[in-house]
């Protein structure tokens, strides 16, 4: 094992089992076992004072006046942990702190580049057109640039003004690609454990004891076998590329495929904007095909969107605290959140009619996404291999989704409730 990794393990995970760090082609580095170990074995423990979390960054702030000088304690506590961690990493990179601080060995093993699209050259970002992450990547790049400009303007006479835009973008990529969930309010960065690569057939997991973060096996492993964790079985190809900079390997002929699309504003619905203000987050539609091949989708807002005023028991426009118009509503005599509305619709006597409307709208959104996908797939523009592969995976998913949606629509059109409604509309017209 390279001496710098040996020193890293000894400092941050003292007492670790027999492991080594090796380079892996196209994957950077990975952790390998030097012995056979059984499921349940704790391979290593990182004491909580050796992980990067709010508490340890706060301790660093308390010990370093220059680092702390940019914000009062109240201002610091108002920052997200992401911002705190990025400032912490950037401060260490600037070399202001003497190279004897405890985090130096962690800093030396961090990758100099990560293949996340936010760090791609602008021309290559455009190769993502037609995929579900093209717009999110463009928005993220813009937000990172705005954050960096704000830092430079606000701290023009202090150390943050020395942070370059590439360093700020890289700090964000490091945070999102290496952070791990914790029982605390925020995720954490864990030296050594963060060297574990992803596998859908992982053999290890992490957990927390009272005073340490542990990496333990949940399968038996052989000598020289790589130790892997699962970055998220519910995450699809787009999210992996967006957050980690790579596309996950298929599981045989199966792969978890997820597409998340922003539901566009409906210019034909005068109540659309008011309905959207009832949502805590921008309304999305999510299509999923899991590793077993099972297909499902999720879009609670569509159930709200397809309801007309006369479909509600009560529906009135009101002003929220910012004096923006929103809606106060009840469906079949009950108040509920947009997220819970689908459950009420399922119990309605007019269920089939409402579900038909929802499926028709979902079909329109999937069809529009597929058309955009196909247009870009055959665009002669030179594309990165990751972009081409993501286009193919999302095209396959959308075609599968459309077959399912259209099959359900054809069945719903034969429903007694739907047939009677169509007949009543024909008579009225």
Curated annotation (Swiss-Prot):
GO terms for cellular component: cytosol; nucleus. Its EC number is 2.1.1.-. Its main location: cytoplasm. InterPro entries: Rubisco-cyt_methylase_MET, SET_dom, SET_dom_sf, SETD3_SETD6_MTase. GO terms for molecular function: protein-lysine N-methyltransferase activity. CDD domains: SET_LSMT (cd10527). The gene is set8. This is SET domain-containing protein 8. Gene3D superfamilies: set domain protein methyltransferase, domain 1 (3.90.1410.10). It is found in: Cytoplasm; Nucleus.
């Amino acid at each position: 094992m390279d001496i710098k990794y040996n020193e890293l393990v000894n400092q941050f995970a003292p007492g670790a089992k027999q492991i080594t760090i090796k380079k892996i082609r196209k994957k950077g580095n990975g952790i390998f076992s030097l012995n056979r170990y059984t499921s349940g074995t704790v391979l290593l423990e990182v004491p909580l004072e050796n992980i990067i979390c709010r508490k340890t960054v706060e301790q660093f702030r308390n010990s370093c006046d220059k680092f702390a000088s940019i914000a009062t304690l109240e201002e610091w506590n108002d920052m997200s942990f992401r911002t705190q961690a990025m400032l912490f990493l950037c401060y260490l990179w600037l070399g202001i702190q003497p190279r004897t601080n405890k985090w130096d060995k962690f800093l030396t093993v961090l990758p100099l580049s990560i293949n996340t699209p936010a760090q791609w050259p602008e021309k290559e970002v455009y190769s993502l057109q037609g995929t579900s992450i093209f717009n999110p990547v463009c928005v993220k790049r813009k937000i990172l640039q705005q954050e960096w400009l704000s830092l430079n303007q606000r701290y023009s006479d202090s150390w943050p003004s020395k942070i370059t835009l590439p360093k700020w973008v890289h700090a964000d990529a490091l945070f999102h690609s290496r952070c791990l969930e914790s029982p605390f309010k925020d995720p954490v960065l864990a030296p050594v454990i963060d060297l574990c690569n992803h596998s859908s057939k992982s053999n290890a997991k992490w957990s927390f004891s009272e005073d340490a973060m542990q990496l333990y096996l949940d399968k038996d492993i052989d000598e020289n076998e790589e130790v892997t964790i699962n970055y998220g079985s519910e995450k699809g190809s787009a999210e992996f590329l967006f957050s980690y900079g790579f596309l996950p390997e298929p599981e045989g002929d199966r792969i978890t495929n997820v597409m998340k699309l922003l539901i566009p504003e409906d210019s034909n619905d005068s109540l659309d904007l008011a309905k959207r203000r009832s949502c805590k987050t921008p309304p999305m539609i999510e299509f999923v095909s899991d590793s077993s091949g099972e297909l499902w989708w999720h879009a609670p807002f569509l159930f709200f969107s397809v309801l007309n005023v006369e479909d509600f028991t009560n529906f009135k426009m009101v002003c929220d605290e910012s004096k923006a118009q929103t809606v106060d509503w009840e469906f079949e005599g009950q108040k509920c959140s947009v997220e819970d509305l689908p459950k009420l619709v399922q119990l309605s006597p007019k269920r089939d009619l409402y579900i038909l409307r929802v499926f028709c709208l979902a079909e329109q959104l999937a069809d529009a996404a597929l058309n955009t996908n196909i247009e870009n797939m055959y665009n002669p523009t030179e594309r990165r291999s990751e972009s081409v592969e993501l286009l193919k995976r999302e095209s396959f998913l959308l075609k599968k989704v459309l077959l399912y949606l259209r099959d359900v629509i054809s069945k719903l059109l034969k429903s007694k409730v739907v047939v009677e409604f169509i007949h009543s509309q024909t008579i009225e017209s």
